[in-house]
Amino acid sequence: HSEVIFRGDSPTGKFTPWKNNPILTQRQLDAERPNPVTCAGHADLVQTREGDWWAVFLACRPINNTFENLGRETFMMPVKWSEDGFPYMTQGDDLVPVIVRREGVKRDESATFGNFEMNDGFDGQTLGMEWMTLRAPATGLYSLSQTPGYLTLKCDSVSASEKKVPAFICRRLQHHKFECSTRILFCPQSKAEQAGILLFKDEKHQYFLAVGRDDQGECISLRQIGDGESKVLASVRLDDGGVLTDLKVVSRGTHYDFYYARQEGVWYVLCRNVDAGYLSTATAGGFTGTTIGMYATLK
């Protein structure tokens, strides 16, 4: 990936390319460099009120120089100017920095980048802006008022493997290493009913940590969902008569660990060392990244 620039006397041309194109790229750099930023491109140039020029562009942060699950993220860099009047961000072995510091700008408590913790009790009238649904607003598939203090999902006859609108409330992964947990109040009445945490890359690449039922009764399972198939990676029987279940996903960057609890704080391992690369751009294609959230289905 790269960004190149041309200059012309009018919007209709003729256009002359800069002799030192590209003005932004990382493709020629050592893949084993520390903290690499890759796939840089799609840049826009903006000017501040002070007259400074900055570039806003897309790029990726791979884990261990192998794959990424974060999609192409938004980066910023100050723009430099060549002696012959062309703007550029990198030349030669210049690195795109992971963090750019600008005088007068500091991080505050509302920052949604870097390391942070977010808890949502779903006690408002609307979902926060960080939450999203697939393709459409999912009207009628969730409620914040049916049980105050809970997000209520409808077990609908649509699955996240279809290009439709499932009962899936999710947010984008922002870190390779993270922990995500939820408390679920759910008593499945049939083998079709399932609810839990879904890691979703696309219709053919998912992990589903779910409370459900099988022939022997209520259970918790981890499924790897692929192209027209679903494989159970782990399952455990629930025979304690409880209705509350805590579910947790811990990402160590290259692998996921999945946990469950029926008593607060008493966590049990369901499955460890699950390949995070299954949800990556390298495996699934695309640059949209992985999402994670609460999901319910009848399929």
Q: Predicted segment positions?
A:
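Carbohydrate-active catalytic/glycan-binding domains of CAZyme proteins
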Residues: 1-299
